[in-house]
Amino acid sequence: MSEKEKVEGYVEHIIFRNEENGYTVLNLSMKGRELTCVGTLPMIGEGELIEASGDYIEHAAYGKQFRIESYETKVPQDSVALERYLGSGAIKGVGAALAARIVRRFGDDTLRIIEEEPERLAEVKGISERKAREIAQQVAEKAEMQNAMIFLSGYGIALNLGAKIYQQYGDNVYRILKENPYKMAEDIAGVGFRTADEIAGKIGIAVDSEFRIKSGLSYVLNQATAEGHVYLPEPVLLRRGQELLGVEPERMQKSLQDMAIDKKAVIRELPAEREGDEPLRIVYASQYYYLELSTARMLHELNITCEEDREAIEKRIGKIEKKYQIELDEMQKTAVVEAAYSGLMILTGGPGTGKTTTINAMIHYFEAEGLDIFLAAPTGRAAKRRTEATGCEACTIHRLLELTGNVDDSSANVHFERNADNPLDADVIIIDEMSMVDIHLMHALLSAIVPGTRLVLVGDQNQLPSVGPGSVLRDLIRSECFPIVCLTHIFRQASQSDIVVNAHKIHNGEEVILDNKSKDFFFLKRYDVNVIWKVLVTLVSQKLPRYVDARPQDIQILTPMRKGALGVENLNQILQKYLNPPAPDKAERENGGNILREGDKVMQIRNNYQMEWEIRGINGIVAERGMGVFNGDLGMIRSINPYTEVITVEFEEGKFADYTFKQADELELAYATTIHKAQGSEYPAVVIPLLGGPRMLMTRNLLYTAVTRARKCVTIVGSDVTFQAMIGNHIEANRYTTLARRIREMQEENA
């Protein structure tokens, strides 16, 4: 490793500072010359003398800069330096004139006077005894902060993280790090178990420390939620804990009991599945146990029926059919009756089974009754599709609940204006694409609905489950506690679409004929990766846009995997090269080894509840503002400004959001996306490359989800053997949830 460069000088001017992450651009005055320095430097103030280590870099727009990796504040050694430091603005209430008077009075002894005899500052004209104490306190606080940063950097803690730690703990940072560094994983965003564990190892915390085991088990439980689980069976938790911590299960069990006593975990038992077996102990992170319990309770409270006679409802439905020239089959009529009669009902069905017609009939029915209806879906794309299909304005669930900026990065701590204290003012709420709704969002939605409101949940249970924890739609169906109508009849118009017909064949495990006689379902047999790449580029850039009358950016490539020759990462680099090549008039930005370029199709890859957006009208006038950009949202890079270091992205629904260069890691190219990321979306045409992959991944419902994303055309490129094998593979990853059980228990308790 090459030795770092060192520079020393006075901080002449802070050019820019991001108050959220501490990223700073400053001018450093160094014996007759100035140097632009950059880095995460939240604590540095103008006038300070620093010695910094780092590297010289060349910025495309601003030229030569020095990137600071670590620094040390130097004590000013002479009167000129002291006056410069005190008058820089670093000490609140001390300007240049007052600084000059202080140094004139005490000379090179100024800092010692401030630290040891602060009352003597009152000898200077313009300084009261109170102000003298305030000046001394500020100097002491800055010194303490710098000492803490040096202490933290000694354990390999980066400046930006060190600043967060100090802001959280202040002077207690020394005690906390030496006693229980794992507390940081609980208290500070950005410090996970692995970071805390690395620091603990340097400090010398024992491998079998109680603090370490508890923090490790909490980490395992939280990681499980990222896989969609709400709890873990105790044997699974202990096995994963042992792999992480290298500690015997017996030692972990004691810590687990202590976590339950401290209300950090909840331990319950599930009855044995077979006679003679022991009950299964399961473990939740506390918040998820109570989240499920509360969700079950609210669902039970909504599950009431109206006093009206079913026959009267059916007569009114007949009038609706006649007025709007709708012809409902028996199951569709049953669905509308249940929606009118029940506090909560579930409507499911695959493509072409008439869900949209049924929803339209429900809307007409409720409108005729003079009821206020809200229509929502988990994503902007799904909401837009529902608006177009019904003529009734739909929005995202986050927008319906009025997301505010009073949140942190965790979906568990999102704040909505609409909640139990300020519920939604609606008579009927219809939620589409329910398979995408996780336990967090479901709980937030139910919290904002008062009993007596009708809730209609619409979805396809055969789609992939939500990205977040839980399996809400399936659990509601499994509970058998709510009216459920499953539409299975494929209507004549839909039956003419091979997309619909083949989707149902895939779901039923039936063979799909690949003879390419279809008008909307094609299979191009190709077995060489290089050939497949060329075919994908040709399809997206030339053939499909003309065939389905759409722009190339509206054609979506969906692939099962992120890695590999046909994975998202590789395909996006290839597609970007052909679909949006570099040009002199296109600004670009390096981002984690990839390039983001003006005109690129991009996707938001994590929920950012604090990201501000605006919808712009004619001449750029702002028509609406809001907050929140979510995992899976698609957009186009409209501009990259190297001077302000801002990337502007236009998302669907005309939302413009500005990303700092530091936030660019929230975006990735989206010419190709995983099938999982396409949940709830629909495209004019999709292209699916299939050549092989792990059996646990290449499943029937993954293929079903991919095919049902297309509105006009599906083209699969690759191996027909892989395609047919996926149809035959009905393995589904089991999610550990107990919502269905909680709902049944709630029903039994209140029977």
Whereabouts are the PLM-identified features?
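Loop/turn-to-beta-strand initiation segments
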Residues: 372, 425-428, 452-456, 713
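Walker B catalytic acidic pair
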Residues: 433, 459
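ASCE P-loop NTPase motor cores of helicases and related translocases
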Residues: 273-428, 477, 483-492, 499-523
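Short aromatic-glycine-enriched beta-strand elements
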Residues: 17-27, 643-649
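Structural detector for short beta-strands of small beta-barrel domains
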Residues: 3-18, 54, 634-638
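Conserved helicase motor core of P-loop NTPases
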Residues: 461-627, 746
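C-terminal accessory regions
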Residues: 508, 624-626, 631-751
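Accessory alpha-helical DNA-binding modules that contact the DNA backbone or grooves
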Residues: 23-32, 36-37, 45-273, 278-280, ...
